[in-house]
Amino acid sequence: MGTTASTAQQTVSAGTPFEGLQGSGTMDSRHSVSIHSFQSTSLHNSKAKSIIPNKVAPVVITYNCKEEFQIHDELLKAHYTLGRLSDNTPEHYLVQGRYFLVRDVTEKMDVLGTVGSCGAPNFRQVQGGLTVFGMGQPSLSGFRRVLQKLQKDGHRECVIFCVREEPVLFLRADEDFVSYTPRDKQNLHENLQGLGPGVRVESLELAIRKEIHDFAQLSENTYHVYHNTEDLWGEPHAVAIHGEDDLHVTEEVYKRPLFLQPTYRYHRLPLPEQGSPLEAQLDAFVSVLRETPSLLQLRDAHGPPPALVFSCQMGVGRTNLGMVLGTLILLHRSGTTSQPEAAPTQAKPLPMEQFQVIQSFLRMVPQGRRMVEEVDRAITACAELHDLKEVVLENQKKLEGIRPESPAQGSGSRHSVWQRALWSLERYFYLILFNYYLHEQYPLAFALSFSRWLCAHPELYRLPVTLSSAGPVAPRDLIARGSLREDDLVSPDALSTVREMDVANFRRVPRMPIYGTAQPSAKALGSILAYLTDAKRRLRKVVWVSLREEAVLECDGHTYSLRWPGPPVAPDQLETLEAQLKAHLSEPPPGKEGPLTYRFQTCLTMQEVFSQHRRACPGLTYHRIPMPDFCAPREEDFDQLLEALRAALSKDPGTGFVFSCLSGQGRTTTAMVVAVLAFWHIQGFPEVGEEELVSVPDAKFTKGEFQVVMKVVQLLPDGHRVKKEVDAALDTVSETMTPMHYHLREIIICTYRQAKAAKEAQEMRRLQLRSLQYLERYVCLILFNAYLHLEKADSWQRPFSTWMQEVASKAGIYEILNELGFPELESGEDQPFSRLRYRWQEQSCSLEPSAPEDLL
């Protein structure tokens, strides 16, 4: 007869914090110590004689056992992490191997002084009598008093939202349970943010509770927590923990008092401390609304609406966001938002109209002004402790008061203030989008979730949420904020054409009058035009399309470009800006004494450069179609390219086309592929040969057979032929670039592999974004070719952008683009750049003055 330990596994956290919580790692990466299972016998089949417990686990005594195992305290202790806040405080076990447990509600937080009267700090109701309430984190007994107050005030139905995204544990304090949160030693005053993909805060709280219970068993039934982290006087406090009932998780604190009140419901709705909610978080909120008939406009709905109660730590930031959302819901329920507007005499400028994103929304949405005013009204009703509009304006004012040369580190740095200003504007803008959603979906009882509705309105994702002012910006300020540089320094000549053509990467599509090149100088432009119109090529008409979204000037024979953080601008605005920059750079620098010295002897805008050559080449036409670097072209970019091609070919089928960007690679190649597809549809397709057998690593991906691509192909009529034609166009254009060794289908997987191999987090993030942008570019070319096929009968009267909205979006294309990724290569965990919101905003906000241009 032998002894063996129980086969139940015990998991022990061992120092690696969970992903996203101010550190790296995942919940799955926690080290575990488990007992070996039986090799040949099991408890179920053996004849157990008796069970003798030891200090840690029961020992089961069985017949005919060959092995013996026991667990000892020392083994468990070896896999936990010890730490202390200072040399004067005792050492103790750390939550998740890193975090200290800190009491998160203090008397100073209760600005409204409502803990004694209502049970929770900063308990309040919105102005105007709507049944929307907000509060800070109550204790268990405090929450019971909140419920009593709501009942006493006659609220028969109530929906309570805890909007905290961080894990919260409640420890016994006399006859009550009070809240504590894990905090990092470096940020003891900040909650943990961002649990990472796939981590549910409720599950995390249960895991931490089990961990603290184990710590207490190893420390004479006590665990150390902190109340005052300022000077650590009298810290830490030892809390007695004899069992798991001495610790509560958030769900227990909120749900147990509601057990006997079936008309009162509780939901965990994690909202971010900074910035706007994610679409998934707003979807979760809408799901609760769908399940609450008294909040909907139903025929048999009667009686008052339920009370909506929102709670976070202090009852200020996230609570205020929840209260504004709840107020908008009740305004729609009461019909206040649907009252007809009086005829406007003179529309007053809105407080937030100074921001470009708000002006863009007002221009785009027919009832946009009314929707913004409703959000402003809701914010004002909830502004007793926190006015979101004022926060945005104050942050913007602070940002304007900081000099660019201020220190780069710390909470007062320009970058930190800029980030807070951007987050607050983003939060305000998403409230406007949510109100727009309510206007369309509230009468339909939320037929679409918020995320699906946004995919049906992709133009809203295109609105750049930046701090750019709606007014004109002085060239001097643009130069200060941006990066003025000489193009020659960052435009590599991969095709070695400078010696012959005076310009980098000049090339032609075989057997087609389609050319691509880097940015030419005035001299190089003359050489190219002479080449195109010589006796061999004899092009009478030449359409030149500049794809640069940067302001470009030629100064003293060299081209300079100005990149600045902010959204792209329209072609006419870009050319106006170039004229202003020319005037600014043509002035002598201020403060110079003696003879006048100018920055440059000659300074020309691109329009002026091309106008000069029009005398020698009367058939020259110049277009400016700004396209974003690295990314897929916008829907309107396809419209403008196709219109330029069709207009020229209708006048002269022999017209030649030249496309140029900074290096003549990424944007130029994409536009050349668009031109090839358009030529084929207008003048006839060549015979597409047999599919080439590819015998290389990742052959499937070299052929462009990514899972998300094939998903799109399956949706499109004759999708495989459509993709095959795009591949043929890519191959045709790529024949001109053989020395560059770049191909769109290949570079997608190549960049993905580089991201996986990157050592630095910032570089990995940049490459992850690039690989998805290249993948999106490929998908968009396939969609454009499908459009050319399907709309050919009507001579493409309906623009591609309209077709995408009216046809493709309804087929679910934007929903696919909103889940872009490589599921065949990595787990299905959601990555931020998989979503349209992050990819499209990134191309509006990011500025990489030192990065080389897109190499495709």
From Swiss-Prot:
Q: Which SMART domains match?
A: PTPc_motif (SM00404), PTPlike_phytase (SM01301)
Positions where Phosphoserine occurs in the chain:
S86
Q: Which GO terms describe its cellular component?
A: cytoplasm; cytosol; intracellular membrane-bounded organelle; nucleus
- Which positions are lipidated as N-myristoyl glycine? G2
Tree of life domain: Eukaryota
Q: Which residues cross the membrane?
A: none
Sequence ranges of Low complexity compositional bias:
1-16
- GO terms, molecular function: protein tyrosine phosphatase activity
> CDD domains from the entry?
PTP_paladin_1
User: What tissue specificity does the UniProt entry give?
Assistant: Expressed in endothelial cells, and in certain larger vessels, in mural cells. In the brain, possibly expressed in microglia. Expressed in peripheral blood mononuclear cells (at protein level).
SUPFAM superfamilies in the record: (Phosphotyrosine protein) phosphatases II (SSF52799)
> Where does it localize?
Cytoplasm, Cytosol
Query: What Pfam family does this protein match (any one)?
Result: PTPlike_phytase
So what family is this one in? Answer: Belongs to the paladin family.
Q: What is this protein called?
A: Paladin
Protein source organism? Homo sapiens
